[in-house]
Amino acid sequence: MRKRTIGILLGMAVLAFASGRVSTAIDSVYAAEESDTSDDEEDEDEEETGDEMKLTSIQSITDFMTCAGRTLPDNIRLWARRNLAVARSHEVSPEERRHAQRALSIMMNIQWKSNYFEAIDPVEARKILDEELYGMEKVKQRIMETIIQINRTHTLPAYGLLLVGPAGTGKSQIAYAVARILKLPWTTLDMSSINDPEQLTGSSRIYANAKPGIIMEAFSMAGESNLVFIINELDKAASGKGNGNPADVLLTLLDNLGFTDNYMECMVPTVGVYPIATANNKADISAPILSRFAVIDIPDYTSEEKKIIFSRFALPKVLKRIGLHQGECVVTEDGLDAIVEQFKHTSGIRDLEQAAEHLAANALYQIEVDHVPSVTFDAENVKKLFV
């Protein structure tokens, strides 16, 4: 049965190679094999603990290398052969074999894609920005310029984006919108929670509890080498409390020259990684890191902008989510002024979004408990609610 499967894999690999879907095709064959070979003996080293569509056993990884190893980057192909030898060897400890198999499983389930990017429809890109962001015309213009550059070169820009502004001004929302435009998977990294560079680079396999770092896990979660890496609170990157500065690790990721994880013991290509960082204070970011980004300053919203965002975006969004019609929760003009006045000393719109939640919840309570058909919030009612 194994020989028949190898033959199928070889045929599928040849057919799928032209379309760049080798690993997907092979994974599908393995899934089919598992479903119709109940009378076959299982591999002794089979340890399927996650998604059955992934290559996790030594035999499945060996078959993949036989059929489609040539589709891998050269250094990763050589690395895989070395680790396969370790995983199959009886001259090393069981711990070493386990680490080798785990590393192979992570690496083999990443699709190593070309760094050629198809043209992006500017009209569709602008539509997404308008859907996700209110105002911010200068910010949208900078993003559109980046999109046009990608369309001309078919590669990612040499510099990532750094969004600098007060908390709650929609920096993360902008980052997600860009990932959506690029049609790439995205992952987030919160630098305020990173105290030790090892959290990013992984730990050496000499330790029994060794594991890959957050960056390598991000590739694994995305399932491909092209992704948007959203780095939140970049200005906290230099405040490491452990053995070194986490900011130094970021430099290797931002240079697009490849990243080496201590656990994986292999340099992975990063030319398809597009970093988008957010920060509150640009002054707290080191010059070397700052030089790797195109900086976009995000201004705070004016009172008029906050009123529009609350009435057209924040409140309707909450009402829809909890099942209320707009006519059931009405905010008068002076009520809207009172809401904005209540939060005039806070930056961004996060507090306004929470105010919309509070308002809608109160309206729903009155409708369900007091059996009123609708609730209107004027300035007086707003002040009572938020005092």
Where do the language-model regions lie?
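Pre-Walker A (pre-P-loop) alpha-helix and adjacent loop at the N terminus of AAA/AAA+ ATPase modules
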Residues: 81-94, 101-113, 120-164
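Conserved catalytic/switch belt of AAA+ P-loop NTPases
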Residues: 231-269
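Conserved C-terminal "switch" segment of AAA+ ATPases
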Residues: 69-78, 114-115, 223, 281-291, ...
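AAA+/SF3 P-loop NTPase mechanochemical coupling elements
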Residues: 222-230, 261-279, 327-331, 376-380
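Walker A/P-loop
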Residues: 157-191, 220
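AAA+/P-loop NTPase substrate/partner-engagement loops
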Residues: 181-210, 218, 305
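The Walker A (P-loop) glycine that initiates the GxxxxGKT/S ATP-binding motif of P-loop NTPases
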Residues: 163-165, 202, 233
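Hydrophobic alpha-helical topogenic segments used for membrane insertion/localization
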Residues: 6-23
